[in-house]
Every structure is written in structure tokens, then in C-alpha cells.
From Swiss-Prot:
It comes from Methanococcoides burtonii (strain DSM 6242 / NBRC 107633 / OCM 468 / ACE-M). This is Large ribosomal subunit protein uL2. One of its GO terms (biological process) is cytoplasmic translation. Part of the 50S ribosomal subunit. Forms a bridge to the 30S subunit in the 70S ribosome. It holds the Pfam family Ribosomal_L2. InterPro entries: NA-bd_OB-fold (IPR012340), Rib_uL2_dom2 (IPR014722), Ribosomal_uL2 (IPR002171), Ribosomal_uL2_arc_euk (IPR023672), Ribosomal_uL2_C (IPR022669), Ribosomal_uL2_dom3 (IPR014726), Ribosomal_uL2_RNA-bd_dom (IPR022666), Translation_prot_SH3-like_sf (IPR008991). Residues 202-237 are annotated as: Disordered. HAMAP family: Ribosomal_uL2_A. NCBIfam families: PRK09612.1. The gene is rpl2. One of its GO terms (molecular function) is structural constituent of ribosome. One of the primary rRNA binding proteins. Required for association of the 30S and 50S subunits to form the 70S ribosome, for tRNA binding and peptide bond formation. It has been suggested to have peptidyltransferase activity; this is somewhat controversial. Makes several contacts with the 16S rRNA in the 70S ribosome.
């Protein structure tokens, strides 16, 4: 009898396919600050978070609260940081986009005012403020796309720490396995034609070939719905 294929097993939600979110340290957001005020704090620690590729910093603010933030390059323990309209334009400080000069690298940009930050948060990435108008600010994203934001959306000055991560090779399959395991990603990924006949519709045979058409109906049952799903055409154009 055939076994469940990986996509079916993943849908069941066993621990193998569930992210270990109980190990994740914190949800990184900008601190809540009134529009006209500024909040100061001190970096008291820099830590690794299994949930992300960049290091995170614990900041103790003057209002008595402690919070993890996205840490830019050049920030160290004991550094003084500020968040608000009157904060100095320097790496680590958080300001509204309306107060940031053009050409400055920024990270952890809010999608809408006070949502905590949504864009440019991965290690080594940054966006650049291109131009400013009365009702919108234009930012060049890490992908090169130009995106419009509300002037009251906040961003952190600087480039996210941990740059060069993708340039360093894993060297061992075991290290890649543990990296993918922290994200609940299945690794290594075996192609269907390399599997046994009980594991995949394309498995089995004396050589690597699907053995049947790779196009499949949109209404095919889950164990058969692999390959080119409801494809209008296949092959090179």
C-alpha cells in the first residue's frame, strides 16, 4: 500500500513540520512612543534568536521597560539609543520617515504608522530613502523596488547586523539541516523520481523518470496531485 506523500504529511501538522516557536525569543517591534516625544534607552545585551538570521539587542528604556529590537551594524552593549521625532540621525536610533534625510540607509520600516516594523529586517539588508513629498515618502527597498510610505511610519537608521551571512558556505550537510530545522523546513528535499514507488507517484522504475504524465487535474486527489497542477502548457516557450 502506498504511503502519504510529503505534502499530505505536512498538512497533518506533526512536530516534524511545525516550527519550534517556543524557542523564539521575542517579536521585534519599535517601542510605543507618543508622536511628539522621544524615548531613550541603553543596549544591555546582544543575543541570537533562532527565529531569525540577524542578532537582536535587548534595550532597557528610561520608562522602565525592556524590549528586543533589530540591531544595526556597529551597535554594542552600553550604547545609548533613542526613539522619537527628536532623536539624532545615527545608527540604531528610530525616527519617523519624515525626519530622516534622503540617502540614509534604514531598516525595520513600518508598513503603516505604529505597526512596529515590517520591511528590511533580515541580516545585512537595508533600504534607502529616495525622496519625500508632503503626503508620502519614497523608499528604495532591498529588492530595488520603489515603495511609498506614510511620513509618520518609523524606521531604524543603519544596516541590519549579520551581513555576509549568505557568502559563508555551510560546508556540512548537518549544519544546513539544523538551520532548516529551526524554520520547520524539511531538509534534505528528495525529488519524486528518486523515491520508491510507495513514496511518490513518480517513484520507482529502473531509471529516473516519472513513468506517467506530469500534468495533473486541479481536482486530483491529494496523493496524486503532484507535478504540473492544472497546467495549460509545459516545456520551454
Amino acid at each position: 500500500m502506498a504511503k502519504r506523500i510529503i505534502s499530505q504529511n505536512r498538512g497533518r501538522g506533526s512536530p516534524t513540520y511545525r516550527a519550534p516557536s517556543h524557542k523564539y525569543k521575542a517579536e521585534l517591534k519599535h517601542p510605543r512612543v507618543d508622536e511628539e516625544s522621544t524615548l531613550n534607552g541603553t543596549v544591555i545585551g546582544i543575543e541570537h534568536d533562532p527565529a531569525r538570521s540577524a542578532p537582536i539587542a535587548m534595550v532597557a528604556f528610561e520608562n522602565g521597560k525592556k524590549q528586543f529590537i533589530v540591531v544595526p551594524e556597529g551597535i554594542s552593549v552600553g550604547e545609548k539609543l533613542s526613539c522619537g521625532v527628536s532623536a539624532e540621525v545615527k545608527p540604531g536610533n528610530t525616527l519617523p520617515l519624515a525626519e530622516i534625510p534622503e540617502g540614509i540607509p534604514i531598516c525595520n520600516i513600518e508598513s503603516k504608522p505604529n505597526d512596529g516594523g515590517q520591511y528590511a529586517r533580515s541580516s545585512g539588508v537595508y533600504a534607502t530613502l529616495v525622496s519625500r513629498e508632503l503626503s508620502k515618502v519614497v523608499v528604495r527597498m532591498p529588492s530595488g523596488v520603489l515603495k511609498w510610505f506614510h511620513p509618520k511610519c518609523r524606521a531604524t537608521i543603519g544596516i541590519v547586523a549579520g551581513g555576509g551571512r549568505v557568502d559563508r558556505p555551510f560546508l556540512k550537510a548537518g549544519k544546513k539541516y539544523h538551520k532548516m530545522k529551526a524554520r520547520a523546513a524539511k531538509y534534505p528535499r528528495v525529488s519524486g523520481i528518486a523515491m520508491n514507488v510507495v513514496d511518490h507517484p513518480f517513484g520507482g522504475g529502473n531509471r529516473k523518470h516519472p513513468g506517467k504524465p506530469t500534468t495533473v487535474s486541479r481536482n486530483a486527489p491529494p496523493g496524486r496531485k503532484v507535478g504540473h497542477i492544472a497546467a495549460r502548457r509545459t516545456g520551454k516557450r
